[in-house]
Amino acid sequence: MFEQKISSEALTTTTSIPATGQITQRPLRDSVRQAVSGYVAQLNGQDPTELYELVLSEVEAPLLDIIMQYTRGNQTRAATMLGINRGTLRKKLKKYGMG
C-alpha cells in the first residue's frame, strides 16, 4: 500500500513485542511517571482538581493526533488501531478540536 517510515527511537521505546504478542510500554509508562512526578513536586502543598482528566487529556490529544496522521485521516483504521469504536474516536477528535 504505502511505505511508513518509523524512527529507530520510536522502535526502541515503544514496540518491543514479547512472546505474548503484547506491545511493551514500559518506556512510555516511565516517561508519564516522570512527568507526573515533576508536576506533583511543583504543587507546593496545593491540591489541584481534576488531575486525572488533565493527565489523560495531555496523553490522549497527542496520541489521537499521531494516529490520525499515521492513518492519513482514516477514522475506521485509527479506531481499530486504538481499540475503540469509530463513534468514540469521532467524539474524542471533536473534544480536542481535531474533527
Curated annotation (Swiss-Prot):
Residues 1-25 are annotated as: Disordered. Residues 75-94 bind DNA. The keyword DNA-binding applies. GO terms for molecular function: DNA-binding transcription factor activity; sequence-specific DNA binding. The keyword DNA repair does not apply. InterPro entries: Fis_DNA-bd (IPR005412), Homeodomain-like_sf (IPR009057), HTH_Fis (IPR002197), Trans_regulatory_Fis (IPR050207). Keywords: Activator, DNA-binding, Transcription, Transcription regulation. Activates ribosomal RNA transcription. Plays a direct role in upstream activation of rRNA promoters. Homodimer. Belongs to the transcriptional regulatory Fis family. This is DNA-binding protein Fis. The lineage of its organism: Bacteria, Pseudomonadati, Pseudomonadota, Gammaproteobacteria, Alteromonadales. The gene is fis.
